[in-house]
Amino acid sequence: MAALTSGLGVLGYLLFPLLLASPTWVTSVSRRHPKSQANSLSGDVACGQPVLQGKLLGGEFARDRKWPWQVSLHYSGFHICGGSILSAYWVLSAAHCFDRGKKLETYDIYVGITNLEKANRHTQWFEIYQVIIHPTFQMYHPIGGDVALVQLKSAIVFSDFVLPICLPPSDLYLINLSCWTTGWGMISPQGETGNELLEAQLPLIPRFQCQLLYGLSSYLLPEMLCAADIKTMKNVCEGDSGSPLVCKQNQTWLQIGIVSWGRGCAQPLYPGVFANVSYFLSWIRYHLQIIPNPPQILPSLSSSPKNTLIIFVTIMGHLLVL
C-alpha cells in the first residue's frame, strides 16, 4: 500500500460510523450481465472458473486450486509483487512493481504456487519477454496508471491449478458483488511476513467516500477503486501489489482491480486503492490482440522456487507501495 500525506478531515470522521453501520458497495443502476459478457483471452480454456470453490492482513490461507490465476513476481529471487494470468503468454500486474532501471532478466514469474518456500508438481516458472507499462503511469498521480502487461517467453500450461482470470465487461456495474483479493504481503503492521498465499474478502467502497477518508491531498482518480473491510480491518499490505481484486458474478470470477496503493496496513480509515481494470480494458485488449507471441520454447517447470523465503517490500518515497 502507499502512504500519502493527508488529513482525514471532519467529513472523514463523520463518515466512519456510516461505514460501520452496514456493508458498503459501489452501487449504480441495478443491471446483471450474462456470463458470456466476461472477457476471456485464453482461447478454449474457461477463464474465472476454478475447479475448487472454496493471509492478507487478518486473512485466511488460500487453497491450492481456489485462486488458480494468482501469479508471484520475483526480482533477484525474491517475491516482490503479485499478478494474474490473462492468457497463456500474458500476466497482468502493477506498473510500480517494475523499475525501468533494472534489467528485465532479473525478473521472473511463478504460477501454480501457493507457498513461497516450496514448489509443487503444478508450479511453473517463466522468464519475462517484455513488460508494457501504461503510458499514463505516474503522469497525473504519483501512482496513477498503475497497470503493467507482462509477456512471458513461453506459454503457460493450464490445469486445474493454473487457470486464467476473466476480464470484466467495460460497462460492469459493481453492485452487491462478492469480491476477494489474494497475495503474499505482510500479515501484520509490524512487518511479519508469511509464505502461504492469503485471501481476504473486501467490500467495495464508493470512491467519494474513499476520497473523504483520505482527504483532499491524497486525491483519487476515476481510474481507481477502493476496498477494505472496515469492521474486521482486513486490508491489503506491502508485498500484495499487482495482485488481483476479483468479484464473482454469475458463477464466474472477474478481475475488477489491481492492488496499487494505500496508507499503511490495517488502518481502519484508509481502504486499499486498486487500479480499475474496466478503465484500462481497451488498452489491455488492444495490446494483447496486436502483439504476436514470442518465439516458442518449452515451458520451464521449477523443482523449487529460487530463494523465495523473504517478502521484499518496495518503498517509493513517502508512498508505501504494496
From Swiss-Prot:
Q: Which GO molecular function annotation, any one, does this entry have? A: serine-type endopeptidase activity
Top enzyme category: hydrolase
Tell me which Gene Ontology terms the entry assigns under biological process.
proteolysis
Look up the coiled coil feature and give its residue ranges: none
Domain (Peptidase S1): residue spans on this chain: 56-289
| Location relative to the cell | Secreted
Show the CDD domains listed in the entry: Tryp_SPc
Q: Where is this chain glycosylated? A: N176, N250, N276
Q: What keywords does the record list, in alphabetical order?
A: Disulfide bond, Glycoprotein, Hydrolase, Protease, Secreted, Serine protease, Signal
The UniProt entry, under PROSITE patterns, shows: TRYPSIN_DOM, TRYPSIN_HIS, TRYPSIN_SER
Presence of keyword Glycoprotein: yes
SMART domains from the UniProt entry: Tryp_SPc
Cystine connections: C81-C97, C179-C247, C210-C226, C237-C265
Propeptide boundaries: 29-55
Q: What EC number(s) is this enzyme filed under?
A: 3.4.21.-
Q: Which InterPro entries match?
A: Peptidase_S1_PA, Peptidase_S1_PA_chymotrypsin, Peptidase_S1A, Trypsin_dom, TRYPSIN_HIS, TRYPSIN_SER
Which residues, if any, are the signal sequence?
A: 1-28
The active site consists of H96 (charge relay system), D146 (charge relay system), S241 (charge relay system)
> What's the family?
Belongs to the peptidase S1 family.
- Specify the protein name: Serine protease 38
Q: Which organism is it from?
A: Mus musculus
